[in-house]
Amino acid sequence: PEADVVITNPTHFAVALKYEPDSGKAPVVIAKGADYLAFQIRDKAKEYNISVVENKPLARIIYHNVDIGMEIPPELYYAVAEILASVLRTNNR
């Protein structure tokens, strides 16, 4: 339940990201999974009211290239920032 958002592709991959704006660091992958594990991540996100966003290319890139506990790479900042901004706007309504 620590994630701020879960990005999916929508069924095969899911990645959970945590972002702490005051840390000065990029969002961190705190969980990721394929197939059944992806389903479990999405299910837990819904249980804890964590936003689930479908973005097939981004979910695949993060799943294949970023390990759990690692920050997202600079080339993904813009795409992830757009998703986080959208989630924050939605949650603050």
Where are these regions (language model features)?
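Helical hairpin unit composed of two closely spaced alpha helices linked by a short loop
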Residues: 1-55, 59-60, 64
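Hydrophobic aliphatic residue packing
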Residues: 5-6, 29, 41, 72, ...
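C-terminal terminal-structure detector
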Residues: 46, 60-69, 75-93
